[in-house]
Amino acid sequence: MSDDIGKILENWDYRLGRVDARRVTGDDGSEKLQMRIDLGLLQMNAQFRPDGKRPFGHPTLLDHFLLRLEKHRNKHGGEDDEFSINPDECAKLQQEAIQFHHRSICNFELNDLEAVERDTDHILELLDFVQDYAAQEEIGSSFQQFRPQTIMMQTRAVGTQFISDENYGEAMEEIRAAID
């Protein structure tokens, strides 16, 4: 079997300015999401981490660090003083956030609004964690550039669901809360 994806790309045109996403079943039987990009496509798992990895045996890298924080607190009387994540760990968390962001874009295009909400919740929790525990404050601050986009995606997903349910007042409340 060839590793060339040319046939797939020939049958799925890239359209500038559009998000083209689809669901496929992987060779392993699991659901995958694909996003067409100009030079190819991105493929990600529909569940858990988009890249399918289990860092340190956990569903996500954030889960690993949250457990590390919990162990630190248990050892230090509930305090999180002296707990930090180094720049390399922050970079790996940033990579995880970007993967979840790509998947949330695909899921929004596919109208899987619950999945968008789940993934944006994960990203926002990750941003909070890095802001609170990055060893270098400027790294924690730099992560915050992703917050407005993530809040916007989450608000669009939740608001769209409210509108679909003809609950316009709740949709407006969601938008106002996001702005605040």
PLM region descriptions:
Residues 159-163, 167:
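Internal amphipathic alpha-helices that form coiled-coils
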Residues 90-98, 143-153, 157:
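Start-of-helix signal in alpha-solenoid helical-repeat scaffolds, especially tetratricopeptide repeats
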Residues 1-130, 166-180:
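N-terminal alpha-helical interaction modules that lie
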Residues 81-87, 132-149:
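Acidic, Ser/Thr-rich low-complexity linear motifs
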Residues 104-107, 111, 152, 157-160:
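Conserved small-residue packing positions in alpha-helical repeats and bundles
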